[in-house]
Amino acid sequence: MNEILYHGSARKIEKPKFGSGKPNNDYGSGFYCTKDFDLAGEWAVNLDNDGYVNEYTLDTDGLHILNLNSSEYCILDWLRILLENRRFDIQSDFGSEAIRYLRDNFSFDYRSFDVIKGYRADDSYFSFAQDFLNNTISIRTLEKALLLGNLGDQVVLISKRAFERIIFKDYYRVSSARYYPSKEMRDTKARDEYRDLRRKPWSKGEIYLMQIIDREMKRDDLFV
């Protein structure tokens, strides 16, 4: 099965190179794509510079694909991977213990997969995750927050095998004048909606990370 993917960049990339990605991206080193052209356009530009949306097809037949949004996994699996690759601003002793607990209890060999599909931790999503780690929001609020802004899933090639299956099709120059405002608007909208979400009154049954640790809760205790 072939999937059409887009990658936003400052340049045209005809041959993605295995091993050249930044190790501190969400899921580690890899080639980060989306199925949404406009999202790729937003990723490609900054305030002062235009960019390129590169179009590819990926033959997924036989590839080992990790879909973090499938029922087999949970939001803490996504967060656990982020903890391995991104640097969080932890403001308390509790936050450090939270990281240790998630690393010890929600680990799995995600690097054995060829492709990872899941949320993209842009600036707003990343701040939501930090709030959860600092015990500021519940796990239910985190799940709702990650649907704000309509960022969709990113598709990340992480194995050499996956890189051998991607084929360049075309590229499109995209303007900062068009895509940077929509990029800013999407982030602002997500943050505004998050503030509205935070203003809602506390509900009985909400589970915070401190409770998860105190009760030594695991995946099966939280997601049934």
Question: Could you describe each region identified by the protein language model?
Answer:
Residues 1-26, 224:
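ADP-ribose/NAD+-binding catalytic cleft of ART/PARP-like enzymes
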Residues 2-3, 28-30, 50-51:
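Short, surface-exposed beta-edge/turn micro-motifs
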Residues 10-12, 37, 60-62:
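Short, flexible loop/turn elements at secondary-structure junctions
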Residues 22-47:
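Extended catalytic/binding region for NAD+/ADP-ribose chemistry, centered on the ART fold
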Residues 47-49, 60-224:
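Conserved NAD+-utilizing ADP-ribose enzyme module
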